């Protein structure tokens, strides 16, 4: 059986928590889009975790978590989250990343921050994680994909 948790582009609507609850029974959990915005908080036997990049399934050793090609992949943040959960006693997650996932670059974050500053009191409340500039590049097909930047033998 397939279960899907799909948001209506509202952002903070509880998708991560619902996915975590359903993850107890899932073999595979796929994060198909989005980036390291506000994130979601998971509380379990290992502790309390604020995830921004990792799919919720990383806490279940029977579950394979997949980051799909629609995700705004912030690689340093991804590595940091994996290190943090492992440090707190979570087994190394089974994690696959699409080779077509596009990478959030530092200039995406810088542009996001500059735009917020430029807008001043009319800013839209960005998390300054580079998501809007990232997706502009993705849809213009000018970004950097994982397949172009990482050695195939690299393990996340």
Question: Where are the model-predicted features located?
Answer:
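Glycine-rich, N-terminal phosphate-binding loop and its surrounding beta-alpha-beta segment
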Residues: 39-113
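Short coil/turn connectors at secondary-structure junctions
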Residues: 1-3, 24-27, 37-38, 45-49, ...
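N-terminal phosphate-binding or glycine-rich loops at protein starts, especially the Walker A/P-loop
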Residues: 2-34
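Conserved small/polar residues in nucleotide/adenosyl-binding loops
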Residues: 155-156
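Short, mixed-charge, low-aromatic patches
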Residues: 32-40, 113-119
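Catalytic cores of large soluble enzymes that bind and process phosphate-bearing ligands
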Residues: 7-10, 14, 66-77, 96, ...
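Hydrophobic alpha-helical hairpins/lids featuring a short glycine-rich hinge
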Residues: 80, 84-152
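Gly/Ser/Thr-rich helix-start
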Residues: 8, 12-17, 35-36, 126, ...
């Amino acid at each position: 059986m397939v279960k899907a948790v799909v948001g209506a582009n509202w952002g903070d609507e509880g998708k991560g928590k619902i996915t975590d609850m359903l993850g107890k029974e899932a073999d595979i959990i796929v994060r198909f889009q989005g980036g390291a915005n506000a994130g979601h908080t998971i509380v379990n036997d290992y502790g309390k975790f604020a995830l921004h990049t990792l799919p919720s399934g990383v806490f279940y050793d029977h579950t394979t978590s997949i980051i799909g090609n629609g995700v705004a992949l912030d690689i340093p943040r991804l590595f940091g989250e994996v290190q943090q959960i492992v440090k707190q006693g979570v087994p190394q997650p089974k994690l696959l990343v699409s080779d077509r996932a596009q990478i959030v670059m530092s200039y995406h974050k810088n542009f996001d921050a500059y735009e917020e500053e430029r807008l001043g009191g009319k800013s839209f409340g960005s998390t300054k994680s580079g998501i809007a500039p990232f997706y502009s590049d993705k849809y213009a097909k000018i970004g950097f994909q994982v397949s172009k930047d990482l050695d195939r033998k690299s393990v996340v």
